[in-house]
Amino acid sequence: MLYVHETHDVVGGKLEAFAEAVRTVWRPLVEAGGDARLCWYWELAHGTSASYQAITLTAVRDWAAWGRLVARRGEPRWREWDRLAWTLRREVTAKIMLPAPWSPLQAIDLAAPPVSAGGPPAIYLHDTGWPYPGKLEEYVAALGAIYYPQTQASRMLTVVGCLVVAPGTGRHHEVVLLQRLDDWPRFAGLLRHGEQGAPRGGWMEAGLSYRDRWESKLLRCAAWSPMQ
Protein backbone atom coordinates (compact mmCIF):
# COMPACT_ATOMS: atom_id res chain seq x y z
CA MET A 1 0.00 0.00 0.00
CA LEU A 2 1.13 3.54 -0.81
CA TYR A 3 0.61 6.66 1.29
CA VAL A 4 0.42 10.09 -0.34
CA HIS A 5 1.68 12.73 2.10
CA GLU A 6 0.66 16.28 1.17
CA THR A 7 1.53 19.56 2.87
CA HIS A 8 -0.92 22.33 1.98
CA ASP A 9 0.10 25.98 2.38
CA VAL A 10 -3.25 27.67 2.81
CA VAL A 11 -4.14 31.31 2.13
CA GLY A 12 -4.34 33.36 5.33
CA GLY A 13 -7.79 33.24 6.89
CA LYS A 14 -8.93 30.40 4.60
CA LEU A 15 -8.01 27.36 6.70
CA GLU A 16 -11.58 26.58 7.76
CA ALA A 17 -12.87 26.95 4.19
CA PHE A 18 -10.05 24.77 2.86
CA ALA A 19 -10.78 22.03 5.40
CA GLU A 20 -14.46 22.07 4.43
CA ALA A 21 -13.54 21.87 0.73
CA VAL A 22 -11.28 18.87 1.39
CA ARG A 23 -14.04 17.17 3.37
CA THR A 24 -16.93 17.80 0.97
CA VAL A 25 -15.27 18.00 -2.46
CA TRP A 26 -11.77 16.49 -2.54
CA ARG A 27 -12.34 13.48 -0.31
CA PRO A 28 -15.32 12.14 -2.32
CA LEU A 29 -13.31 12.56 -5.53
CA VAL A 30 -10.29 10.68 -4.17
CA GLU A 31 -12.34 7.88 -2.66
CA ALA A 32 -14.61 7.33 -5.69
CA GLY A 33 -13.85 3.94 -7.21
CA GLY A 34 -12.43 2.43 -4.03
CA ASP A 35 -8.74 2.76 -4.94
CA ALA A 36 -7.85 5.35 -2.29
CA ARG A 37 -8.97 6.67 1.05
CA LEU A 38 -8.16 9.74 3.11
CA CYS A 39 -6.70 8.61 6.44
CA TRP A 40 -5.86 11.83 8.29
CA TYR A 41 -6.46 15.52 7.94
CA TRP A 42 -4.30 17.58 10.32
CA GLU A 43 -3.77 21.27 10.93
CA LEU A 44 -0.64 22.62 12.56
CA ALA A 45 -1.26 23.53 16.18
CA HIS A 46 -1.15 27.30 16.59
CA GLY A 47 2.23 28.66 17.61
CA THR A 48 4.22 25.49 16.91
CA SER A 49 5.34 25.93 13.29
CA ALA A 50 4.32 27.60 10.03
CA SER A 51 1.04 29.51 9.84
CA TYR A 52 -1.97 28.30 7.83
CA GLN A 53 -0.70 24.84 7.00
CA ALA A 54 -2.55 21.53 6.74
CA ILE A 55 -1.28 18.00 6.15
CA THR A 56 -3.17 15.08 4.61
CA LEU A 57 -2.21 11.42 4.42
CA THR A 58 -4.08 9.32 1.84
CA ALA A 59 -3.83 5.54 1.40
CA VAL A 60 -3.70 4.24 -2.19
CA ARG A 61 -4.09 0.55 -3.00
CA ASP A 62 -1.01 0.14 -5.23
CA TRP A 63 0.92 1.79 -8.06
CA ALA A 64 -1.69 0.79 -10.66
CA ALA A 65 -4.37 2.47 -8.55
CA TRP A 66 -2.18 5.58 -8.28
CA GLY A 67 -1.92 5.66 -12.06
CA ARG A 68 -5.70 5.49 -12.41
CA LEU A 69 -6.10 8.27 -9.87
CA VAL A 70 -3.66 10.51 -11.74
CA ALA A 71 -5.39 9.78 -15.06
CA ARG A 72 -8.69 11.03 -13.62
CA ARG A 73 -7.24 14.46 -12.92
CA GLY A 74 -8.40 15.64 -16.34
CA GLU A 75 -12.06 14.92 -15.61
CA PRO A 76 -14.43 17.91 -15.20
CA ARG A 77 -15.06 17.34 -11.49
CA TRP A 78 -11.31 17.29 -10.81
CA ARG A 79 -10.85 20.49 -12.81
CA GLU A 80 -13.55 22.11 -10.68
CA TRP A 81 -11.66 21.01 -7.57
CA ASP A 82 -8.45 22.54 -8.90
CA ARG A 83 -10.17 25.86 -9.54
CA LEU A 84 -11.61 25.88 -6.03
CA ALA A 85 -8.41 24.70 -4.34
CA TRP A 86 -6.27 27.47 -5.82
CA THR A 87 -8.56 30.10 -4.34
CA LEU A 88 -7.85 28.63 -0.89
CA ARG A 89 -4.23 27.47 -0.91
CA ARG A 90 -0.96 28.85 -2.23
CA GLU A 91 0.92 25.59 -2.81
CA VAL A 92 0.89 21.86 -2.11
CA THR A 93 3.99 19.67 -1.69
CA ALA A 94 3.47 15.93 -2.09
CA LYS A 95 5.50 12.76 -1.76
CA ILE A 96 4.58 9.09 -1.99
CA MET A 97 5.62 7.08 1.04
CA LEU A 98 5.91 3.41 1.96
CA PRO A 99 5.55 1.86 5.43
CA ALA A 100 8.74 0.70 7.13
CA PRO A 101 8.79 -3.08 7.75
CA TRP A 102 8.13 -2.61 11.48
CA SER A 103 5.63 0.26 11.14
CA PRO A 104 2.29 -0.31 12.93
CA LEU A 105 0.63 1.38 9.93
CA GLN A 106 0.76 -1.04 7.01
CA ALA A 107 -2.19 -1.80 4.71
CA ILE A 108 -5.64 -0.56 5.67
CA ASP A 109 -9.06 -1.77 4.57
CA LEU A 110 -10.13 0.81 1.99
CA ALA A 111 -13.75 -0.33 2.21
CA ALA A 112 -14.10 -0.26 6.00
CA PRO A 113 -16.27 2.55 7.40
CA PRO A 114 -14.48 5.20 9.50
CA VAL A 115 -14.48 4.50 13.22
CA SER A 116 -15.72 7.33 15.43
CA ALA A 117 -13.07 8.41 17.92
CA GLY A 118 -15.68 9.28 20.52
CA GLY A 119 -13.57 12.00 22.10
CA PRO A 120 -11.71 15.24 21.42
CA PRO A 121 -9.53 15.41 18.26
CA ALA A 122 -6.14 13.77 18.72
CA ILE A 123 -2.83 15.63 18.76
CA TYR A 124 0.08 14.18 16.81
CA LEU A 125 3.83 14.69 16.87
CA HIS A 126 4.96 14.61 13.24
CA ASP A 127 8.71 14.01 13.06
CA THR A 128 10.70 14.22 9.83
CA GLY A 129 14.24 12.86 10.12
CA TRP A 130 17.06 13.12 7.61
CA PRO A 131 19.59 10.32 8.15
CA TYR A 132 23.23 10.60 7.21
CA PRO A 133 24.02 9.66 3.58
CA GLY A 134 23.90 5.89 3.16
CA LYS A 135 22.29 5.39 6.58
CA LEU A 136 18.61 5.28 5.59
CA GLU A 137 18.02 1.57 6.19
CA GLU A 138 20.05 1.57 9.40
CA TYR A 139 18.12 4.59 10.68
CA VAL A 140 14.75 2.98 9.97
CA ALA A 141 15.86 -0.26 11.63
CA ALA A 142 17.12 1.61 14.70
CA LEU A 143 13.83 3.47 15.04
CA GLY A 144 12.08 0.11 15.18
CA ALA A 145 14.61 -1.60 17.45
CA ILE A 146 15.38 1.23 19.91
CA TYR A 147 12.90 4.10 19.71
CA TYR A 148 9.67 2.16 19.19
CA PRO A 149 10.11 -0.05 22.29
CA GLN A 150 11.09 3.03 24.28
CA THR A 151 7.78 4.73 23.43
CA GLN A 152 5.85 1.57 24.29
CA ALA A 153 7.46 1.54 27.72
CA SER A 154 6.94 5.25 28.45
CA ARG A 155 3.34 5.43 27.12
CA MET A 156 3.60 9.16 26.54
CA LEU A 157 3.37 8.74 22.75
CA THR A 158 2.01 5.99 20.53
CA VAL A 159 3.94 5.42 17.31
CA VAL A 160 1.22 5.08 14.69
CA GLY A 161 3.38 4.88 11.58
CA CYS A 162 6.89 5.09 10.17
CA LEU A 163 7.07 5.99 6.47
CA VAL A 164 9.92 6.27 3.98
CA VAL A 165 9.87 8.14 0.68
CA ALA A 166 9.24 5.92 -2.35
CA PRO A 167 12.13 6.06 -4.85
CA GLY A 168 11.76 8.85 -7.38
CA THR A 169 8.99 10.70 -5.55
CA GLY A 170 10.91 12.94 -3.16
CA ARG A 171 13.99 13.28 -1.02
CA HIS A 172 15.77 9.92 -0.62
CA HIS A 173 17.17 10.31 2.91
CA GLU A 174 13.90 11.16 4.65
CA VAL A 175 11.70 9.35 7.17
CA VAL A 176 8.37 10.48 8.64
CA LEU A 177 7.36 9.26 12.09
CA LEU A 178 3.72 9.72 13.11
CA GLN A 179 3.09 9.65 16.86
CA ARG A 180 -0.19 10.22 18.69
CA LEU A 181 0.20 12.20 21.90
CA ASP A 182 -1.37 10.23 24.77
CA ASP A 183 -0.08 12.06 27.86
CA TRP A 184 -0.14 15.84 27.38
CA PRO A 185 1.02 16.80 30.93
CA ARG A 186 4.17 14.69 30.58
CA PHE A 187 4.82 16.02 27.09
CA ALA A 188 4.38 19.60 28.33
CA GLY A 189 6.97 18.85 31.02
CA LEU A 190 9.34 17.60 28.33
CA LEU A 191 8.87 20.85 26.40
CA ARG A 192 9.51 22.85 29.55
CA HIS A 193 12.53 20.99 30.89
CA GLY A 194 13.97 19.15 27.88
CA GLU A 195 15.84 15.87 28.36
CA GLN A 196 17.48 16.93 31.64
CA GLY A 197 17.74 13.95 33.93
CA ALA A 198 16.76 11.44 31.26
CA PRO A 199 18.67 8.14 31.47
CA ARG A 200 21.65 7.89 29.15
CA GLY A 201 21.75 5.34 26.37
CA GLY A 202 18.22 6.02 25.15
CA TRP A 203 17.15 7.13 21.69
CA MET A 204 18.21 10.76 22.13
CA GLU A 205 21.79 9.50 22.39
CA ALA A 206 21.66 6.43 20.14
CA GLY A 207 19.81 8.27 17.38
CA LEU A 208 22.78 10.56 16.79
CA SER A 209 24.60 7.60 15.24
CA TYR A 210 22.14 7.77 12.35
CA ARG A 211 21.06 11.41 12.06
CA ASP A 212 21.52 14.78 13.71
CA ARG A 213 18.82 16.74 11.87
CA TRP A 214 15.09 16.41 12.29
CA GLU A 215 11.99 18.58 12.39
CA SER A 216 9.02 18.16 14.70
CA LYS A 217 5.52 19.57 14.24
CA LEU A 218 2.49 19.38 16.50
CA LEU A 219 -0.60 18.53 14.48
CA ARG A 220 -4.23 18.63 15.51
CA CYS A 221 -6.66 16.23 13.83
CA ALA A 222 -9.78 17.76 12.38
CA ALA A 223 -12.87 16.55 14.21
CA TRP A 224 -14.04 14.91 10.96
CA SER A 225 -10.68 13.27 10.14
CA PRO A 226 -11.43 9.62 9.25
CA MET A 227 -8.64 8.42 11.55
CA GLN A 228 -7.75 9.91 14.92
Residue ranges, per PLM feature:
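An amphipathic, aromatic/His-enriched active-site/gating alpha helix that lines ligand/cofactor pockets
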Residues: 16-40, 46-51, 59-100, 145-160, ...
